[in-house]
Amino acid sequence: MMSETSWQSDVVDYITKTRFAVLGYVRGDRTLLLRSMGSFALSGFDLYFSSGKDAPKVREIEKNPQVSFFFEHDNQNLETWKSVLVLGRAKLLTTGTEYENAIELLSNRNPHFKERVAKGEMVNTAIFKIKTQEIEYLDYSKGFGTVNKYQLS
């Protein structure tokens, strides 16, 4: 098992260096849906992400807030393959300090998002916070098939 600080810094570093991730959520008819996401940012191990306000996923996540976010870099070698899976509950943010913090973090990470903020387009944007409950960190450099699971709450 990895040391507490080692896995934490490895996971934060890996997520920070990931350009696109995959959001997993369950639709009302219990079908699992996956969506590529480029607008996300970490706050500790919790995660903010944005979407078009009218996107069907916004309504579906409000109904069933249990979601996952999968991070995997392109062009990896199998011997050193890594990925991170974040599992938690998503909450729609609309106002307040946490909402403002999310906008700042998303703007710092994503120039396109920052541009939308500058143009006053936030009225068309939904901002979510995932309260991370579990992290799965796959790291084949520690042995083929090595997946460490960490419960956060």
Model feature map: region roles:
Residues 2-3, 82-153:
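Charged, gly/pro-rich active-site loop segments
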Residues 19-53, 61, 67-73, 81-84:
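Short beta-strand segments
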Residues 53-54, 133:
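A generic "binding-loop/recognition-motif" signal
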Residues 55-57, 76, 143-145:
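Short, surface-exposed beta-strand-loop junctions and turns on beta-sheet-rich folds
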